[in-house]
Amino acid sequence: MVWDVVPFWMNTTGIKYAIIDVETTGMGIQGNRITEIAILVHDGKQVIREYHSLVNPESAIPYAITRLTGINDQMVADAPKFYEIAKDVIEITTDCVFVAHNVNFDYNVIHKEFADLGFPYKRKKLCTVRLSRKLIPGLPSYSLGKLCASIGIPLNDRHRAMGDTKATTLLFEKLLRLDAEQKVFTSFLKPGSRQATLPPGLPKDIFDQLPERTGIYYFRDEKEEIIYVGKALNIKKRVLSHFYDKK
């Protein structure tokens, strides 16, 4: 008997996508914890489900993060803790491709929240930054705000989970249209496609702000001591290459 099996990544029709954004506490002694999450489930044609919740991070939100997101301790004081919404996140994202702008930041933060609960959360990932670089080349910046401004996508409530998720969804739909034959989506969903695994303890804006020009960069350890110095023609691309999955 011969089985004619087509892996899901060879046919992107019928796939559901969970487009996600999380806001977090940023770096801190107790780690990077989620303060807000938004999920839009997309069937490749339209949004079919929405989910949003503030989350009590069980730690103080730094002032700098409150200035960035507008989320403060009072807003999340009565919000559910992550373990109270974990079942919702699992159910909503089951059988979906996990999509985000700089996907590994959001994915790793959520993955760590589940790991702390002893649950092995795993989903296939798709990054709208990588897709945009491939399908809309040559832009000066691929941060969500500047990218949306460049191509005319409205972005309201910047640095709030639902605002960023709605903008990412509009970007995602544009990318789907640009990839009419789905060759790029297929190649990025193919097992073995390299993705940068961003450290979950760093705010994703740090990576958004990296310049795409020639220069020198360096890494510091937790004591602020320089542990690595590099040079690159494209600083952002080179820095991200340090975090590519090796598998």
Regions found by a protein language model. Give the residues of each.
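Extended, hydrophobic interaction surfaces within ordered domains
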Residues: 1-4, 72, 127, 131-190
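DnaQ-like (DEDDh/DEDDy) 3′-5′ exonuclease domain used for proofreading
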Residues: 1-33, 163, 167, 171-206
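Conserved non-catalytic scaffold segment of RNase H-like nuclease domains
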Residues: 2-123, 137-141, 145-159
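Residues immediately flanking
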Residues: 22, 102, 128, 222, ...
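Short, glycine/acidic-enriched loop or turn micro-motifs at the edges of active sites
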Residues: 24-26, 105, 130, 167, ...
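Conserved anionic group-binding/transfer micro-motifs
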Residues: 99, 164, 168, 230
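A generic structural signal for short hydrophobic patches within well-formed alpha-helices
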Residues: 110, 131-132, 239
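A positively charged, amphipathic N-terminal helix/segment that binds anionic biomolecules
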Residues: 176-247
